[in-house]
Amino acid sequence: MSGAVCPGSFDPVTLGHIDVFERASAQFDEVVVAVLVNPNKKGMFDLDERIAMIEESTTHLPNLRVESGQGLVVDFVKSRGLTAIVKGLRTGTDFEYELQMAQMNKHVAGVDTFFVATTPQYSFVSSSLAKEVASLGGDVSALLPSPVNRRLQEKLNG
C-alpha cells in the first residue's frame, strides 16, 4: 500500500490545495493532509478550524484524512508508515525552494517528494492572497472551497 503526505499550514485551504489533494489521491492508496503548526506564526484560523475546513472540503476523497503535525515533515511521514511527500508547485521560485527541501528530505530520511504542477487556473492562488483580497472586500469565491469562503467572510465580518 502506498501513502503520501501533503503538508502545509493551509491558513486557509484554497482550491489550489484541493486540486493537489485530488491529484495525490488518484495516485496513492492513502493521502494524509498534515496541517502543520508553526509556533512562530499566528494564523487567521486556529488549528482546529483549519482541519475542519479541509475535512469539509474533501468529503469526496475517501482515501484522504487530515491530521495535525509539528516538527520535521519526514518524521511525520515515517511515524505513519507512509512513503512520500506531495507538493504543489506554482512558480519557478516554488520549485527552487521545494527542490532543496526534497533533496534534504531524501538525504535525511530517504523520503521521496513528488511535485505536482499547479493547474493553470490556480497558478496565482495562495492563502495569503485570498485573505488579503477578501479583507479588502474582494470576491474570492473562485479561489476557495465554499465552506472556507463562508468561514473567511464570517471571520472578517466579525
From Swiss-Prot:
Pathway: Cofactor biosynthesis; coenzyme A biosynthesis; CoA from (R)-pantothenate: step 4/5
Xref: CDD domains: PPAT (cd02163)
Keyword Signal applies: no
InterPro entries: Cyt_trans-like (IPR004821), PPAT (IPR001980), Rossmann-like_a/b/a_fold (IPR014729)
The organism's place on the tree of life at top rank: Bacteria
GO terms under cellular component: cytoplasm
Site (Transition state stabilizer): H17
Entry's localization field: Cytoplasm
Binding site for ATP: S9, F10, H17, G88, L89, R90, E98, Y122, S123, F124, V125, S126, S127, S128
Record note on quaternary structure: Homohexamer.
Function description: Reversibly transfers an adenylyl group from ATP to 4'-phosphopantetheine, yielding dephospho-CoA (dPCoA) and pyrophosphate.
PANTHER family: PHOSPHOPANTETHEINE ADENYLYLTRANSFERASE
Protein name: Phosphopantetheine adenylyltransferase
